[in-house]
């Protein structure tokens, strides 16, 4: 998170709204920059997450997903058997998704935090309060943007249909509910940014106390952001894998994609994954995902810290101009 921006104007909640909007814009910009930088790792991780073992003989059907040995093998084979552009399949939907997700998350997180600080007349919130606010912001984010991520997951596996085509296909064959597959694990994954941001703020506060400085340098922000994301990623990765499995499956039995093992819901998916792959099956694709999320989160914090100050300043300037024009009228 950026250094706290002090608000000196006396326009009440409007100031909180403007500040929240500045954080939302900077978060969206930073999120898109980060995912554009690390997207191939996300594609590889998704391929590994949805990959399943072949069923034993005698069972009804055999899963035909091409098995990758590990992240490096997946990188090599995707480039060799398909082409390097495949690593960027679904990038457009991912940019839309991360832009919208970051905007919604940062807007509500900043707004709720600012209002809470004002009501409690405090400079900093406690860990529980921070977690609660982060969770509320995360739920708003999931409910708003989950359909985009369902489409993105499908495109990373099969990019033939495109964004609009994939939306239409899901609605036609699976109904509107198909766009919300994986909702329960996605809501559980709200704890990921909650753990991430609380860890970051606690690490930042500790760093500032130890160094005796109030402003962190770019490298320090990058390192703390990476550590915070690593902590959150390890804790919540199994839920991410379950979410990817649920989102990747098609409700159309005639579709080749549906030849993968079908899950009735979250608990059914957890049980079947554990039965077929064991405990380690919940961590498939984790190395490439950790590279993507840790570097991406660190880069996002770095970019957001640089952008947010200017974004909030511009918004306050525009607000003052608007107020002056209204007074003239």
UniProtKB/Swiss-Prot annotation:
One of its GO terms (molecular function) is NAD transmembrane transporter activity. Keywords: Membrane, Peroxisome, Repeat, Transmembrane, Transmembrane helix, Transport. One of its GO terms (cellular component) is peroxisomal membrane. InterPro entries: Mito/Peroxisomal_Carrier (IPR052217), Mitochondrial_sb/sol_carrier (IPR018108), Mt_carrier_dom_sf (IPR023395). Induction: Down-regulated by phagocytic stimuli. The keyword Hydrolase does not apply. It is a multi-pass membrane protein. Pfam families: Mito_carr. It comes from the Eukaryota. The chain crosses the membrane at residues 21-41, 95-115, 131-151, 175-195, 221-241, 298-318. It is found in: Peroxisome membrane. Solcar repeats lie at residues 18-115, 125-206, 216-310. May have transport activity. Belongs to the mitochondrial carrier (TC 2.A.29) family. This is Mitochondrial substrate carrier family protein Q. It comes from Dictyostelium discoideum (Social amoeba). The lineage of its organism: Eukaryota, Amoebozoa, Evosea, Eumycetozoa, Dictyostelia.
């Amino acid at each position: 998170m950026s250094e706290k921006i002090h608000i000196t104007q006396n326009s009440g909640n409007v100031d909180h709204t403007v500040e929240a909007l500045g954080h939302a814009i900077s978060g969206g910009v930073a999120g898109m920059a980060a995912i554009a930088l690390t997207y191939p790792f996300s594609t590889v991780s998704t391929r590994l997450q949805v990959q399943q073992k072949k069923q034993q003989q005698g069972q009804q059907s055999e899963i035909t997903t091409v098995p990758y040995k590990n992240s490096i093998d997946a990188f090599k084979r995707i480039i060799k058997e398909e082409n390097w552009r495949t690593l960027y399949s679904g990038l457009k939907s991912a940019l839309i998704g991360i832009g919208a997700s970051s905007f919604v998350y940062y807007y509500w997180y900043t707004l709720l935090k600012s209002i809470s600080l004002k009501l409690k007349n405090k400079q900093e919130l406690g860990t529980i309060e921070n977690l609660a606010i982060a969770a509320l912001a995360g739920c708003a984010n999931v409910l708003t943007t989950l359909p985009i991520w369902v489409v993105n997951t499908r495109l990373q596996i099969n990019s033939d249909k495109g964004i609009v085509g994939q939306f239409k296909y899901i609605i036609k064959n699976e109904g509107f509910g198909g766009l919300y597959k994986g909702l329960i694990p996605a809501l559980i994954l709200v704890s990921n940014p909650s753990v991430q941001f609380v860890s970051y703020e606690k690490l930042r506060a500790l760093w500032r106390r130890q160094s005796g400085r109030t402003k962190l340098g770019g490298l320090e922000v990058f390192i703390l952001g990476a550590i915070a994301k690593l902590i959150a990623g390890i804790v919540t990765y199994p839920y991410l894998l379950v979410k990817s499995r649920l989102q990747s499956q098609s409700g159309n039995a005639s579709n080749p994609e549906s030849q993968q093992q079908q899950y009735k819901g979250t608990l059914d998916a957890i049980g079947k994954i554990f039965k077929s792959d064991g405990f380690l099956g919940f961590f498939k694709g984790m190395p490439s995902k950790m590279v993507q999320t840790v570097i991406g989160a660190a880069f996002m914090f770095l970019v957001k810290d640089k952008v947010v100050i200017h974004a909030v300043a511009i918004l306050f300037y525009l607000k003052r101009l608007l107020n002056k024009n209204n007074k003239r009228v």
